[in-house]
């Protein structure tokens, strides 16, 4: 769920999901269109695509369990949907960490109208 994803983001990056990732660029937050603004925004685009590959699941409200083993995120065994949602969230949290050096505050609270066009997953 968004709760676990938010905790993963905080643990990985040291940043709160809200406000740092909740409306960043064109893809972080609800919906998404246009070209990702930077590597962090691309993480969100890929995350959206990952969720899009789970048509039988409801990623935002579905809870799952994960733990950390030697600093690494490990998704715990759950239902098929829980496992796949956790893996999508884990990949995004790791992606955010890898791209912390290019995170730019100019893309926080980025206006949707500046995001034009459609990208295919």
UniProtKB/Swiss-Prot annotation:
Q: In which tissues is it expressed?
A: Expressed by the venom gland.
* Entry's EC annotation: 3.1.1.4
The question of whether Metal-binding is a record keyword is answered with yes
Q: Where in the cell is it found?
A: Secreted
The free-text note explaining how the cofactor binds reads: Binds 1 Ca(2+) ion.
Its Gene Ontology cellular component terms are: extracellular region
Q: Which GO terms describe its molecular function?
A: calcium ion binding; calcium-dependent phospholipase A2 activity; phospholipid binding; toxin activity
Q: Where does Ca(2+) bind?
A: 27, 29, 31, 48
First-tier enzyme category under EC: hydrolase
* UniProt-listed Pfam families: Phospholip_A2_1
The record lists its disulfide bonds as 26-115, 28-44, 43-95, 49-121, 50-88, 57-81, 75-86
Please give the SUPFAM superfamilies that the UniProt record associates with this protein.
Answer: Phospholipase A2, PLA2
**What are the catalytic residues?**
47, 89
Q: How does it assemble?
A: Monomer.
Report the protein name in the record: Basic phospholipase A2 VRV-PL-V
Q: Which organism is it from?
A: Daboia russelii
């Amino acid at each position: 769920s968004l709760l676990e994803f938010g905790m993963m983001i905080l643990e990985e990056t040291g940043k709160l999901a809200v406000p740092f990732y909740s409306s960043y660029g064109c893809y972080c937050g609800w919906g998404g269109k246009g070209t990702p603004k930077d590597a962090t925004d691309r993480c969100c685009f890929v995350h959206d695509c990952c969720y899009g590959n789970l048509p039988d699941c409801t990623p935002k409200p579905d809870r799952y369990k994960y733990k950390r083993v030697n600093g690494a995120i490990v998704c715990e065994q759950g239902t098929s949907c829980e496992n796949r949602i956790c893996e999508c969230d884990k990949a995004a949290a790791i992606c955010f960490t890898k791209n912390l050096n290019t995170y730019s505050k100019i893309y926080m609270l980025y206006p949707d109208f500046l995001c034009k066009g459609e990208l295919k997953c």
